[in-house]
Amino acid sequence: MRCLWRWLLVPILCWAGGATAGEYDFAVPEARPKPYELGTRLELRGIYHRFDRDAAPFMLNYFDDDPGSDALEGRGSVELSGGLRLGRMQARLLSHHEYTHGVRETQWEDKLYEGYVSLRPSTHVTIDAGKRSVVWGTGYAWNPAAFLNRPKDPDDPALNLEGRTLLGLDLVKSLSGRGLNNIGLSALLLPVIEDWANGELGSDGDLYLAFKLYLLWHDTDIDLIFFDGPGQPRSLGIDFARNLAPHIAVHGEAALRQDAPRLEIDRQGRTSLQRQDQWSWLLGVRYLTTRDATIIAEYYHNGAGYERDALRNFFAYQASAIRQWQSTGDTAILQSARQMTRAFYQQRNLGKDYFYMRISQKEPLDILYFTPWIAANVNLRDWSFSLQPGMTWTPRTNLEVNLRVAIPIGPSGTEFGEKPDRFRPEVWLRYYF
């Protein structure tokens, strides 16, 4: 009889226990996101230079301090980032600290890349004040319409760039129209304050204005860009990007810089400064194959570039100066040539027309987190080019290994044929935490 009662009580007690437990069930509240974030990025970079000792830039740079046929360069950098959110306000900080053991000298550099406060009084309005990165344009290798962008490295998209000191206003509005779905306006005010704020734009006290009108029209992203100020040409630009299919997208940019300065140098070393309206434009495509290979191709017309004859004169002057120095031993000749050509070599590309192509393959042979690639940049006027094979590998979380080799190819008197390196392997490791 006791066994019978025992078997009857067990399911009753289990049911009662379950019912009682249900009365005390409670939902575990979701963890609130932290109002702050901190991050660090460490990078070690090694570069091997195999010099072209006959190239004009090498002769001008190292005639008074010959490094030999090759040299090693090492860089180590730390980037510290932080963010804070308090209601509708957000603050961000990004600092860059780099030590370089170069071919001729060593140096330590400390820069504030970003440091700004952002206020969002409504979902449609954002106000920024401070130093913030400006990344406009749709081009991959070039951005002719992005007048405020810092020069970027198309083969290193994760590279952080220094921002601009500004006061910014962003307005965004979603629409329900059939054609126009979104519209946005960005207005930037950029002051020049002595050496620490936008000094590369103009003189102390100058004030610059930039606008970008964004439209999402028939599934096409369009930007209309304006930039003007006392020390820069008035500039007008437009860019677009559109997905034609899930695996193919097109993009383009066009820009007009009005009354822009243009410096030329002839075979005798005489310089002339002209003013002209410079049209630049870019058209590109991005294609993803069924085997996860990505192909990017771009054509770029550089309105500020030089025709083939102008480049011939530019390199002929340097060759003449080098011959005079070799025959007379007068170093003042090369010092003068180095000073006169410095502004030209500060330009990323000297020519008029370029073609860029990059092919990357995701995880070939089932090697996880490994992407090899190859890129080529061709000067379509003198047919010299730069070939760059490389790879990116992420062997573990937050660790990235990169390798690339720059190989400039072309005869003397051409843009890439006169590069100071015959080839330049480069490897860098990044660790995030």
Question: Model regions: which residues?
Answer:
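Transmembrane beta-strands of outer-membrane beta-barrel pores
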Residues: 44-52, 86-88, 95-101, 133-135, ...
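Membrane-embedded beta-strand positions of outer-membrane beta-barrel proteins
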Residues: 40-42, 93, 129, 169, ...
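Transmembrane beta-strand segments of Gram-negative outer membrane beta-barrel proteins
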Residues: 28-59, 89-93, 183-187, 372
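Repeated loop/turn-to-beta-strand initiation elements of outer-membrane beta-barrel proteins
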Residues: 87-93, 124-127, 176-185, 217-224, ...
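Residues that define the transmembrane beta-barrel architecture of outer-membrane proteins
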Residues: 70-76, 108-113, 161-165, 205-209, ...
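Outer-membrane beta-barrel "beta-signal"
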Residues: 355-359, 405, 419-433
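Outer membrane beta-barrel
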Residues: 76, 81-184, 188-190, 215, ...
